[in-house]
Amino acid sequence: SEASFMEYTKLGNTDIEVSKLCIGCMSFGEAGTMHDWTLNEQDSEKIICHALELGYNFFDTANCYSAGTSEEYLGRILKKHTARENVVIASKVYFNEDRLSKKAIAREIDKTLARLGTDYLDLYIIHRFDYDTPIEETMEALHELVKVGKVRALGASAMYGYQFYNMQSTAREHGWTPFS
């Protein structure tokens, strides 16, 4: 089968097994909510189903992609075509009111989980560095999500190396979950 050609690896320092290729879902969602070039649910479903057939198990979206409709499409399509434990779902947070404050993170994870139709994320990624929120507040809020089982692993994107280092160091100093 075509799926036998897919290679898998562990996600960072976790035991989460991911396909070496990930399907980015920024192009899935209701047109006009973010971009006019996004794919409708039917076309998104064709791509996701073909990816599953090829052995992809790793899907990445964000709370802001097409005003959340990317997460909605992905959740409905995956639920229709595979068991939750067969896929690794990543989503991102930042482009929202209060960015990476404790309040915003708590609010946005619940909205993301509802849109995806799941009770946990495999990987929660901060989309940017938040200059307005103390690192301690962000890292503690993310740690709480892992502690209560809403998130299995943490990630970060689009920041300077020293910012990533400072966030990792802060997590380790306080005994909180670091980025994977």
Residue map of PLM features:
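Active-site beta-loop-alpha junctions enriched in small/polar residues
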Residues: 26-28, 62-64, 92-96, 126-129, ...
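Active-site mouth loops of central-metabolism enzymes
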Residues: 29-42, 93-106, 127-132
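Residues at alpha-helix caps and immediate loop-helix transition turns in enzyme cores, especially N-
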Residues: 70-73, 101-104, 134-138
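N-terminal binding-site loop/beta-alpha segment at the start of enzyme catalytic domains
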Residues: 2-87, 147
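Structural preference for beta-strand elements that scaffold enzyme active sites
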Residues: 10, 18-22, 57-58, 86-92, ...
